Amino acid sequence: MFNIDLFEKNLKTEKIGKKNYYYASTCSTNNDIWNIFKKNKKAGIVVIANEQNGGRGRGNNKWYSKKNKSLICSFLIKQKFSNEQLGLHAILVPLGIVKGIKETIGKNLNLKWPNDIIYNNKKIGGVLIESKNIDNTIYL
């Protein structure tokens, strides 16, 4: 089971993880993060769940997780970039996640474009990037 205290103790970041929220079960970490942001208007927050029963994928696809078998998280950042650079996040974020997992656990993961994380020819995860323009600032 995920340990939020251990996570926060070992988190070494400047922007992401300033405030973390953990839920044993949730409908969608993405929905949670936008709802939290509406209240406090601060970027750098992370939402982590042990189980998700209404996650979204591309299009109308649903993403379900098994309790104690998945890492489900969303983070929200505020960045200054042009509309042309916005598309780079769709490439760089999944690449960074796969690289980080490879370096941490030493498993050979791959990326099936645009957002599927593959291990042993099976999809084990996905990356969903949502952006919103709020008060002329882009949040991801």
What are these model-predicted stretches?
Residues 1-103:
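N-terminal lobe of the biotin/lipoate ligase/transferase fold
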Residues 19-20, 44-46, 110, 125-126, ...:
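Structural motif
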Residues 68-70, 134, 139:
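Alpha-helix termini
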Residues 99-136:
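Acidic (Asp/Glu) carboxylate-rich active-site/surface patches
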